[in-house]
């Protein structure tokens, strides 16, 4: 029985400390203090901006709403009683409290539990138990609908005293699930493809740590291959389970695949996601996935697993549109058994956007129904391509395929605030185009574009168009073409040439190799002619696409862009680099050196009574040398009233090593300097600004040096400077 005197209440959340030892044995240190302050003082709606400004791994990992995707696809009905083991700062908890009836959390750390409590303080259905799971477990209920172990099972050996910690964990958890309930486990794959390609093992930070079967004596966690995880389930009495594959991994899921809906190679292009540390690049994962998916090996090499123990769920695939403005964030689910595709808003603001799809589908269906009768469709000019000999097409077979219509997948509203489409089989136009490029069949590629132009262009006099009629949104079965997404329909007629050009542009942007292959096989000039877009219009349409993407994203930085901003490196060994890559690396080093030289340049300003200005300034020719030392001389004109020296164009630490006026050492130079940084007792000046400066009142300096007014003089300075990383400078500024 829990001690009622050892409970705290934060808002509506109960914090049960009756089994807390009084010490947090697991902590990220000072960063958790900062995250706790964020949870106390900022609403979740502001977390994205805080993450963007912080540019550090712990803030991203603990506060990103994308973390919740790993459970966000589960079809809760709102009545569920759930248990979350290892809840930490609550990255997953928010989704559970919002969509379930009651939530019990367990975590070892009081500080992390406080973060969880403060960020969800308005949730009256949340109780957090703080302490070791072994101590808390006997008092937990045994009728949960769901128990979640998200990134937890691999640590069982560190918090369970057992010769079989993983089996013991599973058996214990199963005893707390009611009949018909489920256990959900998310965990890394010990031999996930990213580890072969050069990512360090997630927990130990060692390269190939998991691949080498955790040969090191001290490993903080141990993950499993798919066969080993299945064996663990079977050995502990589990017979009903399903494997899902979060991509790129379970931490930041953008797509969820399953054994009933495995990925195609073209869907696996988010592979550079090393937020927390540098990685090697030993091969191109996307290319490796081509053979892996074709040979049915993806379940063995997926980076993560999500296992649902218990009755099957009616979801076989889920895609999250994360990198968007809140009003456009949605998820798309497939139920292959039920033959349904559903779309749901991920935010309250996106509700209207989703509901609008049903109306758009009706309008588009009406357009193409009219076009199938031949009405409202002007004759299109011929394309630049001919029927493909390699594909076996002839003028006669193409003509025999008419009428060449476009089917619009019907869309209906659901009772739970989403929309529903019938599942449509077939192959995407995108995959058929890829197949043509891989086969070296440029004529077939052009023939498919021609077919797009004919079918999508029908009914063009109607005032409705689907702006996002991209190749991936068109599914083909024999002669039946079906558009499966009407999310971005607009109430106006868009020329089919512009829709085709945009689709081709999106196709290229998703994989740069496609444009290179098209140039080799077809040539850009012929391709643009075939699409029907002049060069000047192509430039305009490319700008319009950029504007559209800015509108959709609303300034949200994608995870790929954010990783680049964080500064973690992707290192390709020299032996694996092509000559082109080596030359590019040399050019980059040269550019970085020039930029560094520019940042370390010294600028001198004089104030002759009109204030400091660029007109009365110059760049010092001398550069910082070994140990960051430089000596230079400033000739101060007689009319100058003030002097300013900018030692760099970046945050830095500066020390005035020596100062001489007219060849005589002058200590007054150090005493009289005014800076926009901070003086330290050792004489150094720390600047956290990008525009550091040192300034002297020349009237005072002349008087101290015994130089008459109206006389010029030489000031020789020896400075020592070390640049500061912007993140370090910001941290120092925050502590002032």
Task: Label the model's feature ranges.
Residues 1-42:
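N-terminal auxiliary segments of SAM/dcSAM-dependent transferases
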Residues 407-449:
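Conserved structural core of kinase catalytic domains
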Residues 184-207:
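Conserved class I S-adenosyl-L-methionine
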Residues 218-243:
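Short alpha-helix
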Residues 89-100:
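Conserved SAM-binding loop of SAM-dependent methyltransferases across substrates and taxa
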Residues 164-182:
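A short glycine-rich, Lys/Arg-flanked "PGG" loop and its adjoining helix->strand segment in the class I
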Residues 214, 463-516:
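Catalytic activation segment of kinase domains across protein kinase-like and atypical kinase folds
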Residues 319-361:
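ATP-binding glycine-rich loop module of kinase domains
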